[in-house]
Amino acid sequence: MSSSALQIAKTATYLPDLVEVQRASFKWFLEKGLIEELKSFSPITDYTGKLELHFVGEEYRLKRPRHDVEEAKRRDATFASQMYVTCRLINKETGEIKEQEVFIGELPLMTERGTFIINGAERVIVNQIVRSPGVYFKDEMDKNGRRTYNASVIPNRGAWLKFETDKNNLLYVRVDKTRKINAHVLMRAMGLSDNDVVDKLRHPEFYKQSIDSANDEGINSEDQALLELYKKLRPGEPPSVSGGQQLLHSRFFDPKRYDLGRVGRYKINKKLRLTVPNEVRTLTHEDVLSTIDYLINLELDIGGASLDDIDHLGNRRVRSVGELLQNQVRVGLNRLERIIKERMTVGETDSLTPAQLVNPKPLVAAIKEFFGSSQLSQFMDQTNPLAELTHKRRISALGPGGLTRERAGFAVRDIHPSHYGRLCPIETPEGPNAGLINSLATHARVNEYGFIETPFWEVEKGRVMKEGNPVYLSADLEDECRVAPGDVATDKSGNILADLIPVRYRQDFEKVPPHQVDYVQLSPVQVISVATSLIPFLEHDDANRALMGSNMQRQAVPLLRPERPLVGTGLESQVARDSGMVPITKVNGIVSYVDANEIVVKDVDGNEHVHFLQKYQRSNQDTCLNQRPIVKNGDQVISGQVLADGSACEGGEIALGQNVLIAYMPWEGYNYEDAILVSERMVTDDLYTSVHIEKYEIEARQTKLGPEEITREIPNISEESLNNLDEMGIIRTGAFVESGDILVGKVTPKGESDQPPEEKLLRAIFGEKARDVRDNSLRVPKTEKGRVLDVRIYTREQGDELPPGANMVVRVYVAQRRKIQVGDKMAGRHGNKGIISRILPREDMPYLPDGTPVDIVLNPLGVPSRMNVGQVFELLMGWAASNLNCRVKVVPFDEMYGAEKSHQTVQAFLEEASKQDGKDWVYNPKDPGKLLLKDGRTGEPFDQPVAVGYSHFLKLVHLVDDKIHARSTGPYSLVTQQPLGGKAQQGGQRLGEMEVWALEAYGAAYTLQELLTVKSDDMQGRNEALNAIVKGKPIPRPGTPESFKVLMRELQSLGLDIGVYTDEGKEVDLMQDVNPKRNTPSRPTYESLGTSEYAED
């Protein structure tokens, strides 16, 4: 055990800061990205060239945010800072310079945890992985089966340039997928002579055919080439030489229109072995000529030229927050530039000031649009700390400038050898997004160019150099090295022991002697993501199930009393710390004060550092965020130490579930098909009880008939129902509420038309005006109950920002404790999930030889076909650990300590546990890992010994309370008039095509008819049916479904003369829908059957 714990400690020290990818990127944006953009737009000149506006980018300044993070969340505000930049307006005619600091917009700021607060909600900007700008060479098969090659020059922004060859060995070029143009026409248009081109090529004879072809077409000069280019790129417009020059310049040589970016320039220089300076971001003649030369070498199959794999991580780069935000700022500044130019032209030149020219709105709008509605700005998943951390490390191929789900093929989604140590091969969603959304591997980092790097130890002459710092390599560099896996066995001084080592070299595997190894992987965990690295014995699980295990850990609900796993991997504390859920001290010192709300640390100099704790806050997913101190008064603390536990944390480690005693055996069919049988102890001891906080909100608005009022005086409500309301009509904090109870009383003025006829009659007789208001109170929804935790009232008088038309907003937070119940979903860490089918009294559960009843009974058939044997290792290791009263840390991939190491370790632990006093029954060498259980109901032993042990089991966020739903009558869809779907819409259950086939197969014609008509979209029929049921009359005959009428109308709108006709050929007017026979039942009703029976008596 010590070696496992020790090794992981050694690995864990190198785990980098897990949210660094977000923070570093935003820091870059503030320090460089924003200044770059402001500089690139400076100067802005008007159309006459008389005025110039310069942004002095280096001198931009951010004001202190108006609200801090907590206040922004409370007020539904954005945690943002105002940006000011110094502007100089220069009048070229008079030489006058006006300088002014101008407000250019609000910039949302990143919190310490790597998130943004937008309108009070915490959001995360997901990293995007896109194709890197650069030059790419591909081969394609034409329709005759001949292989052709093509080269694409892809800029960061601007027109794509694609070179291709045809069967006659002619070179063509396409600009942005337009028509093909002879490549030499482009060369001539760029001002290159035939000799310029030929001299640069290593094999000019191939290219000479293209020159001849151009001459044959009569394009001999630069002017003719420019005309030809203009004709092809702008067909239908009169061509001109100047137009051609301008077009060519703006497409490829204008830095504002065409930008390869730093990355694009770096990649092109690297691929084509050029020495163009990094500052040159547009195309050069050299780039184009070298691309053609490389393409010819491919065609002639000359060594040194290689094709590119677009799925290789060397050709894909990550765009993080900083860059995405920079692109958005560019969009805003583009709009601003147009406005400034217009204002320069319109305004009085002498009296203009920079502040009058610069309008902050376009930039504010662009930034707001990005944070509010971009596909990459997502509502943070706050179910538990792991979900939060994983969300910040997510890498998506979707979003603007990326792929779409429909277009993405298998190749993009597949695992690529270059993902090794960079993207996790396991953690990705199931379903349409599989492989498009990935997670960063544990040790990976993103370099300045946006390529993902991963660390290795250097190997010199067969010795692993662990003394220095690890070397970070990008996918391109790693391909050229021989890299050994992290679990190679070494002696104490780091010499590799085996004679032949498996290595990866150029995306292939080979075996080499130790002195040929260049690098060794840093740790066995570096291949996988954070969530996956929390699965113990991962190497014994099938990848599909490990994927489910990784994803389900993110859905674990924080429990009331969390418990650390008995069997962990050693990364639990790092995950808790980096998720930002636990407060950490930044100084060495002594704890001078502790209570439930704050912890004060006094440092060496006597300064006090106060840490406020979160108490029962609602998370984005309605789970409960609460922090509990774990230090005592007078404790000594060191910098970086955890002071309190957050939700789903215990002792500074992440604790997503509970360690429970599990037996693998069938029990009366209650665990058929992955169902789970649990003991009542889970309910009574609150093992799986969680707190959920719901937010209810109501606005008092200004209506046409007068203002709505929040009041205690609600018409037709008993005094009893108002017991818990205060004098304003708002529920008091601490009150217990059930579904249907009033939270906030509100009345709305009622117009004349709203009054029922009987009220009009009373008014006519008595002449007095009853109070004409309607009850519109906020009530607790069906299936919800709980205790009022907090009430917040927002009014304009207090200075709160309210939505337009609202006079007052009241928010009520209701907390509920949810115990585990039948229908809840539970899961282990190995993808073994199931639904609770029954909760048994503990006296009926199977029990151990010492009388302990088990907590959960799982089906043994869930293991063999799913091949997630890791759960069995965890079970037995947990069993040994609980008997030895210790916790175990197991490194995934432990073969470096010897073959079959997991097996040996577990066995050794079990033997150790059985040596304790009175514990000899714990391990039976004849039936290792199994015990003979007895039936709690009869006391008889079961036929076979059963695998029993402790496993870490989670309760997932898919709770039955949130899913269970019923409808009698409810809302209908507007067009089809069919009931809506889903719980939120109070919808019905869908009767789909296949269900109709089932009823047809049974010949249940009447059942089918009423399901398709009166129970669905026969509008008149359903009203009559309801009326008939209420009055106890026979149910009338169904009419025409509304969706049939919609179908008819749709066919008619296509110009088809289509109608419904009777046998006699008379057209039926569906829109009229009055059926004279409607009231005579088309089948015997229950009532008519009953009466006829009595008549016979």
From Swiss-Prot:
The keyword Ribosomal protein is assigned to this record: no
Catalytic reactions of this protein: RNA(n) + a ribonucleoside 5'-triphosphate = RNA(n+1) + diphosphate
InterPro entries: DNA-dir_RNA_pol_bsu_ext_1_sf (IPR042107), DNA-dir_RNA_pol_bsu_external_1 (IPR019462), DNA-dir_RNA_pol_su2 (IPR015712), DNA-dir_RNAP_su2_dom (IPR007120), DNA-dir_RNAP_su2_hyb_sf (IPR037033), RNA_pol_bsu_bac (IPR010243), RNA_pol_bsu_CS (IPR007121), RNA_pol_bsu_protrusion (IPR007644)
Top-tier EC class: transferase
Composition-biased stretches (Polar residues): 1077-1091
GO molecular function terms listed in the Swiss-Prot or TrEMBL record: DNA binding; DNA-directed RNA polymerase activity; ribonucleoside binding
Superkingdom: Bacteria
GO cellular component, one term: DNA-directed RNA polymerase complex
GO BP terms: DNA-templated transcription
Subunit description: In cyanobacteria the RNAP catalytic core is composed of 2 alpha, 1 beta, 1 beta', 1 gamma and 1 omega subunit. When a sigma factor is associated with the core the holoenzyme is formed, which can initiate transcription.
Family matches, as HAMAP family: RNApol_bact_RpoB
Family according to the record: Belongs to the RNA polymerase beta chain family.
Protein role: DNA-dependent RNA polymerase catalyzes the transcription of DNA into RNA using the four ribonucleoside triphosphates as substrates.
Protein name per the record: DNA-directed RNA polymerase subunit beta
Species of the source: Prochlorococcus marinus subsp. pastoris (strain CCMP1986 / NIES-2087 / MED4)
